[in-house]
Amino acid sequence: MATVQFFNQFPCKTRVQSSANSKPLSKPPSSLVPMSALTRRPSFPPGEFAVSRSDFRVRVIDAEDELDPETSEGGGSALLMAEEAIESVEETEVLKRSLVDSLYGTDRGLSASSETRAEIGDLITQLESKNPTPAPTDALFLLNGKWILAYTSFVGLFPLLSRGIVPLVKVDEISQTIDSDNFTVENSVLFAGPLATTSISTNAKFEIRSPKRVQIKFEEGVIGTPQLTDSIEIPEYVEFLGQKIDLTPIRGLLTSVQDTATSVARTISSQPPLKFSLPGDSAQSWLLTTYLDKDIRISRGDGGSVFVLIKEGSPLLNP
């Protein structure tokens, strides 16, 4: 538009066509502008306004420069941060799976060798350094629910985990259920026998003492009534010291014993749970949560003992 305005400054008159009787002009009128004036680059005396063409500079960059936070305005930096966050999450998931795999066959820590314990301890430390919930007590919705004990270094539980403590009875599950609405904790041990299961649990209240630590005060213990399991199927034979022993002659006797035991178990099952109080001196403890997400919780208790728990319903419970 500046060029058009520049050309409009020149005077211009319309040329009138002469009639047939008129004489041709001997020379062009002085008011007409010669073509050379239109094609010649105009010059401006000093101080006059001149229009210049803008300069355009083009910079070629490659893909690496585009992702460099120093050369990009902000998009590259945001993309780099997003990629780092995704990579961190993937590393955490790999660590979680590696930890769960290393727990296989340890019987919650009872049967773990010293080498396995060292490997588990290293994986726990790595996970704690990537804790996505720095203040677990501010995220009670994650703490809420039932947690299954997968591993512990607490030697006080080892006698309980030992299979020889009661013949034919094993520890089927150890769990902790947290109700963040009522600030209660239930620790439960489920025992499984040939005909029934039963549980021993403790009920407690907890108080928040820091972003990671809660104080626990146990109130009572409960011995649950046995729950009947399916009947035992008596095999035709068993192997003992490499010899097959035929059970057919005594299957009737074994069936009679089983029926009697079932009758006794039904009688016991109809009774209410047995509750008992806990001594005041040993009824308090504290718990420090060092890692927490929707699947895994790592806590440390008195004396530095560590507990690895997996949330009920998590796919990590299915190896």
Swiss-Prot record:
Expression sites (tissue/organ): Expressed almost exclusively in petals. Very weak expression in all other organs.
Subcellular location: Plastid, Chloroplast
Pfam family, any one: PAP_fibrillin
Top-rank taxon, per record: Eukaryota
Start and end residues of each stretch annotated as Disordered: 17-39
UniProt GO cellular component terms: chloroplast
Low complexity bias locations: 18-36
Induction of the gene: Down-regulated by drought and oxidative stresses. Up-regulated by wounding.
Transit peptide feature range: 1-59
Keyword Cytoplasm: no
UniProt xrefs under InterPro entries: PAP, PAP/fibrillin_dom
Keywords: Chloroplast, Plastid, Transit peptide
Family, as annotated: Belongs to the PAP/fibrillin family.
Role summary: May stabilize the accumulated carotenoid structures.
Protein name, per record: Plastid lipid-associated protein 2, chloroplastic
Biological classification of the source: Eukaryota, Viridiplantae, Streptophyta, Embryophyta, Tracheophyta
Name of the gene encoding the protein in the UniProt record: PAP2
